[in-house]
UniProtKB/Swiss-Prot annotation:
It comes from Escherichia coli. InterPro entries: Arsenical-R_ArsD. Gene3D superfamilies: Glutaredoxin. Inducer-independent trans-acting repressor of the ars operon. Keywords: Arsenical resistance, DNA-binding, Plasmid, Repressor, Transcription, Transcription regulation. The keyword Nucleotide-binding does not apply. The lineage of its organism: Bacteria, Pseudomonadati, Pseudomonadota, Gammaproteobacteria, Enterobacterales. GO terms for molecular function: DNA binding. GO terms for biological process: negative regulation of DNA-templated transcription; response to arsenic-containing substance. This is Arsenical resistance operon trans-acting repressor ArsD.
Length: 120
């Protein structure tokens, strides 16, 4: 199976739920990472603040930092090749990269509201 390597900018944690500010993009991406792992995808994440040597030891990450600086992160490598930089991918993009079908989420066929129910 393919391998995704994520080089995150310096941050306190990778979940997006750090301190008083919640970064919804990171929250979504963290959920998507767990979704991928649940489907057997191997993922490595490195945080510039906590694992700077991982950036130095990886030629692609090192060259990227030299050219774009930390403000250009995140950097995503798929099997060692750059697939995205500067933003986190959406779940649909991740699914496409790994050939994983997205589950369709549909609307309920009937509503609980109306009629003689008291649910609303």
């Amino acid at each position: 199976m393919k391998m995704l390597t994520v080089f995150d900018p310096a941050m306190c944690c990778s979940t997006g739920v750090c301190g008083s500010d919640v970064d919804q993009v990171l929250v979504n991406f963290s959920a998507d990472v767990q979704w991928l792992k649940g489907r057997g995808v191997q993922i490595e994440r490195y945080n510039l603040a906590h694992e700077p040597m991982s950036f130095v030891e990886n030629e692609k990450a090192k060259a990227f930092l030299e050219a774009s600086g930390a403000e250009g992160l995140p950097l995503l490598l798929l099997d060692g090749e750059t697939v995205m930089a500067g933003r986190y991918p959406k779940r649909a993009e991740l699914a496409r990269w790994f050939g994983i079908p997205l589950e369709k989420v549909g609307l309920a066929s009937t509503s609980c509201c109306g009629g003689k129910t008291s649910c609303c």
